[in-house]
């Protein structure tokens, strides 16, 4: 069965760079942009309290990406880096049914470390404009959209970072467009899931009912509770509202049903075709994707003691782990 994991605030990458953080430094990192929220974001963004989410949300922009429409582009949402580096850029994907806001705690640290990092919303999720121009949101379309984004704006081999289902996106992309990828970083990869399986055969009425359930607060609260321990209810509730913000866009249900009905990602046969150097980070305490599944076959995992599906966010006085694939 396909494992579903919603985005969470502190995805990290491997080869450790430790950064001592005090409360003042955290406030600086969270301050970010002092501007307004982009007008295309759902109005519910105003109610979010997480300073990292608010800061990163103000930086979301839409860039035109040419698809198969001869004279039309998809305005595609992303976080564009302010840093231009000679090193390979990091391109950060997200989990199933999530957005670039998943990287809200890690992204400031990456920038502070001098890395050129793009946080890109996968087609059919995030905050792109799919009201008028919505292609099928199947695997092939998601792959082609990412390639067109890379071709238009990144233009050189990248370090592609994918957590959970994002790892399947990264594997599929690297096999089909090897010239666009230098290395892979996979975090708790959901690489052995066999797509959406029986969900792909559901009648449309039932499929839409199920998708409506996906954005419900109780279900997402439960998913966040599985991923984190020792976090207050009100913090979990705020993170839940961050994670479901993109679900408020009018095209979300159609695009998610399109993905589920297509069969989803099944990259098991592609794993052995991956030729790029790959770093895998996984949590020994993950309750969603088994560590034993991560390290089987052709995948070699680096366990993160105490990690659940994703590590908890950095807090004042603690060490933040920042992954650099070099």
Please provide the spans of the model-predicted regions.
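Active-site loop/oxyanion-hole signature of alpha/beta-hydrolase fold enzymes
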Residues: 6, 49-85, 111-162, 176-177
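N-terminal chloroplast transit peptides
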Residues: 1-33
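Serine-hydrolase catalytic-loop signature spanning alpha/beta hydrolases and amidase-signature enzymes
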Residues: 87, 95-105, 117
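Hydrophobic, aromatic-rich cap/lid helix
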Residues: 240-267
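Short alpha-helix in the alpha/beta-hydrolase fold that links the catalytic acid
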Residues: 267, 276, 290-298
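Flexible "cap/lid" loop of the alpha/beta hydrolase fold
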Residues: 171-214
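Short beta-strand/loop motif that positions the catalytic acidic residue
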Residues: 274-275, 280-282, 286
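Catalytic active-site module of serine/aspartate enzymes centered on a nucleophile-bearing elbow/loop
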Residues: 3-4, 8, 296-326
């Amino acid at each position: 069965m396909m494992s579903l994991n919603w985005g969470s605030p502190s995805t990290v990458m491997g080869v450790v760079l430790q950064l001592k953080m005090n409360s003042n430094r955290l406030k600086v990192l969270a301050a970010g942009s002092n501007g307004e929220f982009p007008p295309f974001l759902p109005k519910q963004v105003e109610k979010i309290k997480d300073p990292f989410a608010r800061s990163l949300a103000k930086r979301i922009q839409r860039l035109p990406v040419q698809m198969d429409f001869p004279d039309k582009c998809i305005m595609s949402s992303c976080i564009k880096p302010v840093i231009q580096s000679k090193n390979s850029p990091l391109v950060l994907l997200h989990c199933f049914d999530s957005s670039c806001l998943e990287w809200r705690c890690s992204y400031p640290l990456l920038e502070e470390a001098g890395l050129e990092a793009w946080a890109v919303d996968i087609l059919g999720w995030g905050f792109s404009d799919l009201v008028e121009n919505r292609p099928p949101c199947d695997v092939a379309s998601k792959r082609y959209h990412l390639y067109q984004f890379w071709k238009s704006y990144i233009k050189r081999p990248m370090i592609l970072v994918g957590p959970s289902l994002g790892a399947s996106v990264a594997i599929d992309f690297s096999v089909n467009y090897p010239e666009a990828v230098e290395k892979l970083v996979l975090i708790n990869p959901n690489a052995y899931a066999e797509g959406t399986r029986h969900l792909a055969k559901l009648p449309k009425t039932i499929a839409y009912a199920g998708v409506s359930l996906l954005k419900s607060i109780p279900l997402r609260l439960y998913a966040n509770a599985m991923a984190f321990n020792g976090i207050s209810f009100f913090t979990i509730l705020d993170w839940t509202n961050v994670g479901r913000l993109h679900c408020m866009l009018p095209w979300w249900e159609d695009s998610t049903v399109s993905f589920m009905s297509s069969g989803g990602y099944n990259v098991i046969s592609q794993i052995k075709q991956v030729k790029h150097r790959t770093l895998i980070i996984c949590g020994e305490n993950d309750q969603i994707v088994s560590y034993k599944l991560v390290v089987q076959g052709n995948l070699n995992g680096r366990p993160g003691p105490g990690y659940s599906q994703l590590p908890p966010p950095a807090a004042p006085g603690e060490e933040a782990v920042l992954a650099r694939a070099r």
